[in-house]
Amino acid sequence: MIRRACQSVKKLPKRPCFWYNKGNGGVFMENWRKDARHEPIIVDLEALVPKEHLLRKIEKVMDYEWLYERLDPYYCHDNGRPGTDPVVLIKMVLIQHLFGIPSLRQTYREIQVNVAYRWFLGYGLLDNIPHFATVSYAFCKRFPDELTSEIFEHILNKALNNRMLDTSAIFIDGTHIKASANKKKFQKEQVAKAARVYSGQLRREVNEEREKLGKKPIEDDDGENQGSGGSQETAEKTVSTTDPDCGMFVKGEHERQFAYEAHTACDKHGFVLGVEVTSGNVSDSVAWDAVYDKVTDRFPEVKFVTMDAGYKTPWIAKKVIEDSRIPILPYTRYKGKKDTFKPWDFTYNVVNDSFVCPGGHELRHTTTSKDGKRTYRSATQVCKDCPCRSVCGANENGQRMLTTHIWQEFLDLVEQLRKTERGKEIYAMRKQTIERVFADAKEKHAMRYTHHRGLARVSAWVRLKYAAMNLKKLALWKWSRSDFFVFLPYFFFDCLLYTSPSPRDRQKS
């Protein structure tokens, strides 16, 4: 039956071949070989750039008059060959950072063939683009060193004036940037340990406690009295022979590389408020003071300071709380032995400044180290016959020791704040604020590694990255606001149209 049905169906004619025509001697159809590469046309460059292009939105919010006034003293207007417009050079660098182009050389090549880039610079299709060496020389030799910081601050002020910042809570964290240095080319050096910001205050409080305990005061050994024979602590450091300013960054258990660290602060909306660049081997808690002081001096209305576990130190908790702000820090796991009494199992006696163990024995305050750590010890005779000795965690001498910091009460207060609903809510915003800033900077703006060498050049490079990110967010937000206000009259008209009574309803009433 199927065979009969197939035989009854007429054979359809063959489809004509559009690629090969036997009648014309096997020549391709001319309509498919149209070539307009050499066709002369008259076109307006303005019409070639899409209306929704990012550079159009940036051009609408950015002003450059202050740049001309700022850079006017660095140009000669009555002698020599005319120089390149400085705003054009700055725009070329902004293009590089806005679109994540790795180098100025590649940026120069992209601008030559990109119509939108030429429009943004104000150049025509046949105009010669400034060479990338001209841009590099201007930023290295001609322009002032603080220009990148001024560009960053100017864009941040624009966001502030447009009420786009929410600095009620700030988020501080650090991310590493791979340096342009071979990790196999290094040398070991003995370098002096940098003095902490709080070392003087800590030493005074420690010496006060040591005097009460009948101990000798700790002398100043941070290098302030080297002229009088004082000693300064040193440490061995791995120094790159290619870029001595970078530091060895331990990335995981097996990976080590030379890198820089960008310690960054942002607000609730992801706008970068401040950045401090250090070598990769500098701890987050060491560089925290510079970032925190800079941001809070400019935005004193900050109420919450959110950080990760790397910033959970007594000094940071103390400074934030004494500034009448609330530190939001995460839970950190206990690093002691699992089968012994934990520090929170001991009860503190405020009157005697001592601890009472779960077995009912007293641990007295014996000394305070120069690091600010108080040591509490139990009596050997008491612990000798204690039934809890197997789980007590006593040392070889039969003494149970407990160590707390001189500013431990601030860390205890941080733990209480962490458990509040407000604290949990704000800490959960880290993934959409500071972590999002780092993700966008590395994935969209090529901040995963740098070709620059030297701390000053890398710092300027990072500030331009963050300035471009703030400018992009500012332009997109302002563009969306303008669209909203354009649509707003039509919205109210529709509301009046549907809510107003019809003529028939008026007659009935």
Q: Which positions does each model-derived feature cover?
A:
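Short, Lys/Arg-enriched N-terminal segments with co-localized hydrophobic residues
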Residues: 10-28
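Basic, amphipathic alpha-helical segments enriched in Lys/Arg and hydrophobic/aromatic residues
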Residues: 282, 380-385, 424-496
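Basic, short loop/linker segments at the boundary and entry of helix-turn-helix/winged-helix-like folds
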Residues: 51, 56-94, 99-100
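Cysteine-cluster motifs in flexible loop/terminal segments that predominantly coordinate metals
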Residues: 356, 360-366, 372-402
